[in-house]
Structures are given as C-alpha cells and as structure tokens.
C-alpha cells in the first residue's frame, strides 16, 4: 500500500458520494498519510463553482496526523491546452491535475489529443495528467511521455480505469508506464475515488507497474516527502505543517 493518494472527488462533484470528513476517517483507518481532494473543474456540468476551489484555503492542513492537499481535476478545454483553472484558483491550490472529459472536450483524433495534452503540460500550470490511457482519447504515447519528463509533469495510472470507468485502458496504461520509465519521468497513482471506501486502492495500478518493471523511485506516491519535494520543485511553497509527514 502507498501512503499517498492524489485523485479523489467529494460530494462537491455531485456524482460522488463522500465528504472531506469521510476521507479523513478512511485515511486514518487505512494509514494514508497524505491525500489530495481533486473535485472536477467548473466546466463540468456537475462541478463546484470556482469559489469552492478558492475557499479551500480555510481547510486545516493536518487533521489527526493526516495531511490534506487542496487540488482540482481540471479539464483540458482545447488544442491550445487551456484548462478551466486560472487566476485565484491557481494560487489557492497545491495540486493541479488536468485531463480530458467528454462533456468538455469531445473525442477527436490522436494528433489533436496529443497536441492538446502536450500544450497543457507546456503551460507550466499542470502537475499531473489524469487517466492519459483512456482509450476514447488515444495519444502518441512516446511523445506525451517525453513531454511529461521534459516539463516535469506526472502521468497518472488511474485505478478506476481498470474497475469502473474507461474500460479497455490496460494496454495503453502499460505502454504509458513503459514510456515514462524509458523517458525518466514520473508516475502518479490515483484511486479516482468517488466514495471514500476506495481511498488508497491501487491494486490494479500495481499490476500495470509490475508488468513493465517500473522503478519505485519514479512513483510519487511512495512517500509524502517525495510528493511534496516534487510539488516544491514545481514552485509550490513549502507547507510547514507537513514537515514531519
């Protein structure tokens, strides 16, 4: 089990079913030391208003020894790589994830998806790309892995993609993991929980990584300090409350 989970949704995304308190309780039960709440960006139909993201600043950083990161799963909106996270949202959040979602960016062709994803990474706003192995959004996998390594953006292996969403992602995700390994980039694991019961669930992710002998030293979830060092290298101010995580 890894002590860090980087992708989950609360009732603020109304197709999810758990609260911040639910996730804290489950993290304590499972030994998760650090997690990120990453509700959908405002361009999704059932997403929270942008005030929700700006107001995350009122959250405590640490509850009963569990660290809480303030995040978003933003939407890649167009071929220029624009995302629905800007202005005060960017400065209020610790973790900016970006990905394709059909209601915002209808599937097109491999070249268009690749160009949009690389543009989002090149913008400097994004720390992590969500579910890049989605078969509905094929991409040039070596090209995105090389770009991710160049721009220091993690590519996600998403456990939900093998269980309840984006079925048929396995082959793409194995290829992505191998390409990231070869490019010297970072992988991030996300449960993509829409209920707290699956917090920290990475069983299927682990199978993908094992299949390509992915190196542990390039997985951000191995420890809170590794993830925090990565975010700080990307410009996030050090968070004093997390010093002992």
Curated annotation (Swiss-Prot):
Molecular function per GO: phosphatase activity; zinc ion binding
CDD domains: PHP_HisPPase_Ycdx_like
Entry binding sites for Zn(2+) 2: 15, 40, 194
Cofactor detail note: Binds 3 Zn(2+) ions per subunit.
Record Pfam families: PHP
Record GO cellular component, one term: cytosol
Positions that bind Zn(2+) 3: 73, 101, 131
Keyword Methyltransferase attached: no
Top-level division of the source organism's lineage: Bacteria
Entry keyword annotation includes Hydrolase: yes
GO biological process: bacterial-type flagellum-dependent swarming motility
Entry keywords, A to Z: Hydrolase, Metal-binding, Zinc
Enzyme class: hydrolase
InterPro entries: Phosphatase_YcdX_put, PHP_dom, PHP_phosphatase, Pol/His_phosphatase_N, Pol/histidinol_Pase-like
UniProt cofactor(s): Zn(2+)
Binding-site positions, Zn(2+) 1: 7, 9, 73, 192
Entry's EC annotation: 3.1.3.-
Classification via PANTHER family: PHOSPHATASE YCDX-RELATED (PTHR36928:SF1)
Record NCBIfam families: PRK09248.1
Family according to the record: Belongs to the PHP family.
Subunit structure: Homotrimer.
Stated name of the protein: Probable phosphatase KPN78578_10290
Protein source organism: Klebsiella pneumoniae subsp. pneumoniae (strain ATCC 700721 / MGH 78578)
């Amino acid at each position: 089990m890894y002590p860090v989970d980087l992708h989950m949704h609360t009732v603020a995304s109304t197709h999810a079913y758990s609260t911040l308190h639910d996730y804290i309780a489950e993290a304590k039960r499972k030994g998760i030391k650090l997690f990120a709440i990453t509700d959908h960006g405002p361009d999704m139909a059932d997403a929270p208003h942008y005030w929700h993201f700006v107001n995350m600043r009122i959250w405590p950083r640490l509850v009963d020894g569990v660290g809480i990161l303030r995040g978003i799963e933003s939407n890649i909106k167009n071929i220029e790589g624009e995302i629905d996270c800007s202005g005060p949202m960017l400065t209020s959040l610790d973790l900016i994830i970006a990905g394709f979602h059909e209601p915002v960016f209808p599937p097109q062709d491999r070249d268009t998806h690749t160009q949009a994803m690389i543009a989002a990474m090149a913008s400097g706003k994004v720390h992590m790309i969500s579910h890049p192995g989605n078969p509905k959004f094929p991409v040039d996998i070596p090209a995105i892995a090389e770009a991710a390594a160049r721009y220091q953006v993690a590519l996600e292996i998403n456990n939900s993609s093998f269980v309840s969403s984006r079925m048929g992602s396995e082959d793409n995700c194995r290829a992505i993991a191998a390409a990231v390994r070869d490019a010297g980039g970072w992988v991030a694991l996300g449960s993509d929980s829409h209920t707290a019961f699956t917090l920290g669930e990475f069983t299927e992710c682990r199978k993908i990584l094992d299949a390509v002998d992915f190196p542990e030293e390039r997985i951000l979830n191995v420890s809170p300090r590794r993830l925090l060092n990565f975010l700080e290298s990307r410009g996030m101010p050090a968070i004093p409350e997390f010093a002992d995580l």
